[in-house]
Structures are given as C-alpha cells and as structure tokens.
Amino acid sequence: MIYELFNLLGDLPGARLMTYISFRAIVAGVMGLCISIWAGNWFIQLLRRKNISETQRDEKIDPFNVAKKGVPTMGGVVIIAAMLIPCLLMGKLSNVYLILMLITTLILGCLGFADDYIKTFKGNKEGLNGWIKIAGQITLGLIVGLTLRYSPEVVMNERVTSHIENNITVFEKSPEVKSTRTTIPFVKDHNFNYADVFSFLGETNKYKAGWIFFVILTIFVVAAVSNGANLNDGMDGMCAGNSAIIGVALIVLAYISGNVVFSDYFDVMYIPGSEELVVFMASFVGALIGFLWWNGFPAQVFMGDTGSLTIGGIIGVCAVIIHKEWLLPMLCGIFLMESISVILQTQVYKFTKKRGMRMRIWKRTPLHDHYRTSMEQVLRNDPTCKVLFPGKSALQHESKIVLHFCIITLILAALAILTLKIR
C-alpha cells in the first residue's frame, strides 16, 4: 500500500527510497519485530483473561512440560499478524510471488488455528483430523505448483552472463522462459532440469512430465517442511529461533535469485520479481525475533500449530519459488532430523514389539526430547524396553538444547549459502 502510494508521489524527495528492495526489507523487518513485541504482550494478557491456555499436559505423555500447563497458546496469531501487516504496507501487492506467500500464510494459518482451537476449546488432544491437514497441505502445494506453471508472470532467465564493453559491465540474459530448472549443490553446473529425467518420453512430453514432477515435489516440500517445523516446536524458543535463522538464509538466496548481478556471479537462474520475497521474508524474520521476546525460556506464550505449520509452509514455498528446494535438506537439517527420528523410532518400535523385544533407537522423540530424557523415565513407562543409543546419563537443560540446535541451524544455513560457490 505504502509502496503504491510512493509510486504516485513520483519525484518528491524521499519517494524513490521505496524502489530499493533493501530499504523496504529493513523497514518491513523492523515493523514485524515491533508489532510482534507489542502485540505479543497485548495478546498474552488477552489470552490470560479469557483463560485460553495449554491444557493437554499429561505427565505420562509429556513429562517435561507439565509445569507449563496454563501457559497461553495460539501465539502464532501474533506471528502471522506481525508478518502480514508489514508485507501489506511495504510489499508490491501485484507481485505474483508475494501473493503466493500471502496465500500460504493464510491457508496454513487457518489450518493451524483450527487445530489449536479444537485442542484448547473442545478438549480434544488430537486436534484437527490428520487427513484434513494433509488435504490442506496438498491443496496449497497444488496452488503453488500450478501457479508457477501457468501464470504468465512466472518466468526465469536460465543463464546470465556478463562482459566488459567500453569499460562498462554489460549483462546478457537468455530469453525469459518457463522452466523446471532448479539449483542443486556441489556440482559444476548448478542448474538441473527435471524435464531431463524424462528425456525418454520425447522432446515434447518430457517437459509435461517435468512439470508434473515439479508440482508433486512442491506438494511434498510443503507437507514435509511444515510438519518438520511442527515437530521442532517442542521447547521454548526452539522453532522460532531455528526458523528465524533459516529465514535469514532465504533472504540471501531470494536476493541473489532476483538480482541480475548476483545471479551472474553465483551462476544461478535469474528470476525476475523474486526479489519481492526479500521483503516478505524480512517481515517473517522480524516477526519471529519479536515473538522470541515472549517465547524464549521460560515461555510466556506458545505459538501452537497456528505458528509452526505456517512457519514451515512459508519456508518450503519460498524455497520452491526461487528453485532452491534441494538446499532444504541442509538448510532445514534440524527439521529433517526431527522428522526422521520420529519416523524411525515409530517403525522400529512397532517392528520389534511384534517380535516381543520392544526396542527404541533413542530414549524419546522428536530428537530434542532425547537429550532431556533419562533411562529411568523410559523404564518407568516401559520397563521391558531397550534403547539402542541411550547417550550420556547427564541430562541437558531445555535452554541449552535450544541453543545447541540453533547453533547447528546457523552452521547449516551458512553451508547452504556457501554451496552456491562450492563446485
């Protein structure tokens, strides 16, 4: 809105500031931070007055967080508001990529809110039916994938080269095309086209198959990252801290993809218009840092599924839009480890239970719970259980585990960016 207003002001002093992505991103980030801190305090007081708080804290199911029963939840509403307001004010609302991010926020925000509402007000600890969540994630994935396929505004320049001519750097771009090219790390040519996998289908059909694969992959990425973030949200400040770091890395990657100079330097696809994601992700990071003011240990509010599902979806969709989805296993390494730990633990336990052994890989999952669980706690609930990797007997404090996980995410985020130059 403000962006459009400044465009109308034309050549008035200061009006051209709004044409700079860096300026709008900084303003959006600061606005998100301030709104999150201010609204967080107001929201916490409101939830306490309405007695809207965590109620599902069973000592057998969640022995660590029994003391947190009564802490206000659904704080993800604050994060969403602190993201949307700066974006609506500072963003170019006609940009297709920004519109997709706003749709992502609203769809997953509604899904998460419905889940939290059922848990809090209906007393149903299962929350929203799992199939409804999956249906929502599939729908979002289809919207994103099909928009990237059919919107005339979604194009890319697969190659950008530069040379010096009369002491001036001249950039030459390949024709704007729709493409299923993506960036893959650790190879000489960073660009890989999904359509090439289906070359055996012929020149025409391989592109159709490539787009079908891309849409399916988009659905998978949306579901996987949003669920990974949801699993990571188990300690005070954990999900918000990790996601803020990932958000900063995505700001860098989006800026590179939307800037012709840096696209040439890093030899990645130039995606016109994707620089608008820098504004959105800046408000995303600002909102999360502001939320940490209240969510850091000891938490005064929880984000709930309203926050975690939305956060994960935003990360996944942003990566898909800038064609950096293959950097997500590294960038979101913590989310990946949390998800894999739950899947492996569940399958191994079921498999061994049928054979009368009752075996676990870790003491408890998601993985962050392993480091604050003692063998005594495991054996108290399951006396015959064996743990393959019990780890050290000394337990770690919640705040220390969060710090360690955030440091790991910081290292992984730096490595993900560095892969653009490692070939």
Model segments located where?
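Short aromatic-rich membrane-water interface segments that cap or initiate transmembrane helices
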Residues: 18, 69, 185-210, 268-278
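Membrane-interface helix-loop junction between the first two transmembrane segments
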Residues: 41-59
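Short juxtamembrane and helix-loop transition motifs at transmembrane-helix boundaries
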Residues: 59-68, 123, 199-207, 264-272, ...
